[in-house]
Amino acid sequence: MDTNQVNYIIWRYLKECGYSHTKFAFERETGIQNLDKQWGSTCQVGALVEILQKGLQYVELEKHYVDNHSSNEEASKTSIDGESLVNENPCKLPFYLTVPHICETTLTKADSTNGFCEHNNSNDHQLKILQDKGSGSPSSPVMPFKDKIEKRDIDITMADESNVEKDPARPIAVYNSSPVTEITEIKQVTFTGGEDIKSDFFKVIPTKHPVTCADWRPLLQENYHVYEFSIGMTNATLASVSICEEQNDFKAKTDYCLQSSFDNQDITGVAWNNSGSFLAYAFFSGVIEIYDSHGSQILSFHNNKGPVLSLKWSGTDTYLAAGSADGTITLFDQLKQTQYSIDTLASSVLDIEWISFDEFVTSDVEGSLRVYKVDGKAPVSTVSHAHDNSIVALRYNLRISLLLTASSDTTVKLWSRGDAGAFECLHVFSFSSPVNCIDWNLREGTPILAVASNSIVSMYNAISLQQLAVFMRHTAPVSALSFSHNGRYLATGDTSGGVCIWSCKTAKLFKELGSDNSELIAVTNVLPEEQVNFLRWSFDDKDLLIGKQKKEIICCCDFLHDSL
């Protein structure tokens, strides 16, 4: 068998055994989806996969269950089979490829004071290396096992912080005996536009502090009625919120809420990785913290001396890249559990986009584009003064390998990579005012892009460069826009708090959310706390998050029940 055939067998094994996260990363790394599947008709791939499954059952059993080392001498002499391991010490925590595994067992208090036991396998050595690091790039050690955060013990209200010991190496969590907090103050807001609109289409979820950013956790197949998103707020507060939409019933609850040790620091970025196993937060001080899906801190980086302005995972979840206002780029390698910094010797890094699994492009206030590889600290290629002014946004279309850049010099440019790897400009879109928002419609078919200049949103064909539609509904400059993943909707928000949801098929207004302060906005044209800072679609396009600098986050619900 050649390499491709071996890869195909491994891919089939991962797929049929339900290892969805590993299968996703393996597909992206090997390009297995582009290989010839006809080979499977001439070889008994199913039989080979069955052999792999049987052979690895014992390996998985050894990984998922832990010997009770405190058992008496007679018990230790007795051979322990798989069934007894399952009954005595089942592991309660999930496995990931990128972090050392810690087994949670049902040990008695005499065996363990906190109910957690370090798994005695090859991961022990990796964990010891992480905890013993004392040189190199500064980072916080892995959190002690006793700091594991259980979802049921944490309340979003953060009411009692007096009895919590503040440790600068880890976040502060408030422990409560009460169950998960149910958010009961959900209210409805007024809206206009569209036909057959339900009165509960927009939901307002209150928060403890003003919201600065949010991101959806990738949808888990085992519970497709529950959607989880994480939000970052002022005062260094992080929270995870779950919403349940089943049988027209909308419920929201707080899974956990954390108070970081960096008080009075706004959270500037939040990003889930593609498999939903790790969550990264960035602070105005430049600190970056990584958490697992249960809310436990894994690592903390202190390389940046300025606010982190861009925070993005690579497509395979292998790397995390962060761009800072001090011109520093921080890279974290999940597989090696290492991180390092790149000093761009330039001004602020405003945005970062991954263009392959190990390459990314950056933009800065000088209007330059730089391409980096993860294994080097010098740029692979540079386009100096790609724009006459700062490049405020980057969007890369991986399917057609085109880069879109937006600048405050009132232009948007379309780029492709030449034979030497450097970006070359294909076309310039000129506007009458600075451009702050751009996005790609990533549906299959003709590539479409959207540009917002002042209060006008334009949609173009990226191949013919023809203008397809112009949306003129906003009365204030557009501050955020986003296409849904299925390409059916375009959401736009402005500095006055107005939000419009457009049909991409008909180029007509689908739904609209008005501002609560329309009279005041008509005079001032802007209210900082009303400005729409971000729009985030859920992975199945059923819900849309609307974020402002207010103590609330708005959720637009049930898009799947509306037909265009």
From Swiss-Prot:
Q: Does the keyword Acetylation apply?
A: no
Indicate whether Iron appears among the record's keywords.
Answer: no
Domain of life from the UniProt record? Eukaryota
Where is it chiefly localized?
Answer: cytoplasm
Task: Give the UniProt keywords, A-Z.
Answer: Chromatin regulator, Cytoplasm, Nucleus, Phosphoprotein, Repeat, Transcription, Transcription regulation, WD repeat
Q: Name one GO molecular function term.
A: transcription corepressor activity
Cellular compartment(s)? Cytoplasm; Nucleus
Q: How does it assemble?
A: Component of the set3 histone deacetylase complex.
Q: Under what name is this protein listed?
A: Set3 complex subunit hif2
The species is Schizosaccharomyces pombe (strain 972 / ATCC 24843) (Fission yeast)
The lineage is:
Eukaryota, Fungi, Dikarya, Ascomycota, Taphrinomycotina
